[in-house]
Amino acid sequence: RSGHLGLWKALRSPHVDFFVSPYTYAFRGVGGDGLPMQPTESLRVHGKLYLFEEDTLMHNNFDPGGRMHPVEKSIPIYQRHFAQVATHGLGITWLENNIYAESPLIVDESRRWHRRFQELGEWALRLDRTPAAEVAVFLDDESFRYESFRNNIDIPLIWHQRVLSLNRFGAPHDLYLLNDLLEGRLPEY
């Protein structure tokens, strides 16, 4: 729901190199954002790679009319997600397989953009990848133990602030686990 129970332990493991998750399920459509589920800057300071699973295709296939938006609007969604991963130093996986194939309406344009994303991604790897956020925001991966199963306070105080407000408050931000601050792992802000 709002915590990442046990993430701190996994980040400290020498046996884990990367994490994969889809982007948040809220605000997936046009006008939304591509917010990763994990506190990606914590992964970075621990030397782990975050792979952003771009699964718009799968969700649009659940509802032929497009669960989040018309299929024709998928390209701007893909562009938004590429911008998210390129500006935050993340990896990305594009979900397309024999079960979930790209719509015939946009298949040629989609393939053209995926090639362009690959070119831009390879170029971006040569750039300075130092985060340039102005604000650090902290999550406590153990806070879930103290939350209720009711949505009376957890949703407005945790989920809404993180998912609704952070990407719209006007300053670039990095998202960390609280333990990163307590252990002195953060850059200067």
Please provide the spans of the model-predicted regions.
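Short, well-structured alpha-helical segments in soluble
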Residues: 7-12
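Carbohydrate-binding surfaces of carbohydrate-active enzymes
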Residues: 13-189
